[in-house]
From Swiss-Prot:
Location of this chain's protein in the cell: Secreted
A single MF term (Gene Ontology): heparin binding
This protein's encoding gene: Vegfb
UniProt keyword annotations, A-Z: Disulfide bond, Growth factor, Heparin-binding, Mitogen, Secreted, Signal
Descriptive protein name: Vascular endothelial growth factor B
Subunit structure: Homodimer; disulfide-linked. Can also form heterodimer with VEGF.
SMART domains in alphabetical order: PDGF (SM00141)
Primary location recorded for the protein, binned into one broad class: secreted
GO BP terms: angiogenesis; cardiac muscle contraction; coronary vasculature development; heart development; induction of positive chemotaxis; positive regulation of cell division; positive regulation of mast cell chemotaxis; positive regulation of vascular wound healing
InterPro entries for the chain: Cystine-knot_cytokine (IPR029034), PD_growth_factor_CS (IPR023581), PDGF/VEGF_dom (IPR000072), PDGF/VEGF_growth_factor (IPR050507)
């Protein structure tokens, strides 16, 4: 559908929605219900930031070592319909919002701060087409998916946090370039062996 035809259709529908009175599903006075107008339905369905509920485990991509309360939060994310099937609703503006989350690990609990991504502007853009991968080549991802949220700790003074736990570094093993042992130092090299052979031959000739 061309953009001009789409605009003409939208104008015609707007005029029809303004001139036509809404008709209730039930004619009886006891069953009268409010009918949402077409313009309101269209406005609610457009691509825009809207409040959604997201699980924190999904935001952190499974990097959760403690129980989080609450286990899900509400954030503003892009969503809605686009006028063409070849378009998708994507964010063109985002920012970070910090929230306090209670982290529980028996027998203690502490408050932490979580930085979550929120969308402020959305737009319908062409869908990304996946590039064809040749069977004799292995597809290598350009980037590794990163979590949308970052969890930081706000512990009480003196309390240890995961960032404070230092894992001991294993003791270095024997080096591959270690000095030769005493046994190997006693074994004559090729030059020493040649000199000994020459000295033996001279001694035999003199005898």
């Amino acid at each position: 559908m061309s953009p001009l035809l789409r605009r003409l259709l939208l104008v015609a529908l707007l005029q029809l929605a303004c001139t036509q009175a809404p008709v209730s599903q039930f004619d009886g006075p006891s069953h009268q219900k409010k009918v949402v107008s077409w313009i309101d339905v269209y406005a609610r369905a457009t691509c825009q930031p809207r409040e959604v509920v997201v699980p924190l485990s999904m935001e952190l991509m499974g990097n959760v070592v403690k129980q989080l309360v609450p286990s899900c939060v509400t954030v503003q994310r892009c969503g809605g319909c686009c006028p063409d099937d070849g378009l998708e609703c994507v964010p063109i503006g985002q920012h970070q919002v910090r929230m306090q989350i209670l982290m529980i690990q028996y027998p203690s609990s502490q408050l932490g701060e979580m930085s979550l991504e929120e969308h402020s502007q959305c737009e319908c853009r062409p869908k990304r087409k996946e590039s064809a991968v040749k069977p004799d080549r292995v597809a290598i991802p350009h980037h590794r998916p990163q979590p949308r949220s970052v969890l930081s700790w706000d512990s009480a003074p003196g309390a240890s946090s995961p960032a404070d736990i230092i894992h001991p570094t294993p003791a270095p093993g024997p080096s591959a370039h270690a000095a030769p042992s005493a046994v190997s130092a006693l074994i004559p090299g090729p030059a020493v062996a040649a000199a000994d052979a020459a000295a033996s031959s001279i001694a035999k000739g003199g005898a």
